[in-house]
Amino acid sequence: MLAVGMAGAALLSACSSSSSSSTTTTTTKPGGTLASNNAAFLAADLKAPGGSLNASGSTFVQPFFQSAFYTYSSKNQGLTINYQGVGSGAGITAFEAGTVAFAASDVPMAASDLAKVPASAGPVVQIPDILGGVAVAYNLPGVSARVKLDGPTLAGIFDGTITMWNAAQIAALNPGVTLPAHAITPEVRADSSGTTYIFTDYLKSANPTTWTLGTSKTIAWPATAVQTPKNSGVAASIKATPYSIGYVELSYAIQNKFAYAAIKNAAGTYVVPSLNTVAADADQKPNVSATDFSIVNQAGATSYPISGYSWAILLQKQTSDTTGAQVVKVLDWTTHTGGGQDLAAGLDYVALPPAVQNQVRTQLLTVTGTTGQTLLSK
């Protein structure tokens, strides 16, 4: 069985102006070879103990988790998985308080957060669970052409220094497009958000000296910005607000049929987010860790520059053998080909590269139970 908090997960089906379709060059995803014993682990994963498993956090990953956990529970009907999409920051807070068995965040826990976890719990294990893009979606009546934006212009829109759709900076990037003489309404997150972190990480990377609002899950946005919690909240606000522009995980943009911008990447190419372009960005940095996780603004002609991994966070030393076994088996199944990763493309996410999947399993094999026993097995 599955119980997923839908307040933060609803994928709205209404559409906005102009098409978001695009043709992109197929790009090889980051490589590596999946471990030969993968099938044996996946079979054992489906034998997790019954009961109830509680988790919370990222809304970036929630549409994927919703489908993956539903599929898992259809194969192991004794286990109910309760995932609440409350935002990365709130999920980490719940994890620190011990009210959830694992959390999800689009940015790994910082040192200040890790310090709040009891030392007796051992090192916190942080594993990638999916790969996705952050789309810059907009509601621009009367404009059918896809809008092009670069780093400086996007930063100006969100720091409040570019306020009109027909501003010279935007017009220069979109020759031949008649842009409305109308004020821009920036749509941003009000809560502590990993999606915000990825977005502002890109803005800082693309504008190292001029982006002054920082790289963080929470930002002191200008007064002109409309602040709404969760990806679903920002999507709903974009839908309801003509002349607005905001950032949402790609699956929310596609499900809402939003128009979204082509962003100028580090190679000088205008690229829209897609499975191929997000994979191309990740391909430029095949090795990621909880301390070296940013993949924004990578080189490569087809790289989409606002891309990132989402992360699952759990204790290395579990205080309950039952809950611990549930956590590692569900997460192992979810993060591997043959399990949850098979669902990624159909939900507009990019599956973890095989090398990253192998890294994830290696980390999950370090998670132990009350007597020090390894909880993940094949």
Residues covered by each model-derived region:
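Terminal low-complexity, poorly structured segments
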Residues: A7-G8, P30
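Flexible loop/hinge segments at secondary-structure junctions
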Residues: S16-S17, T25-K378
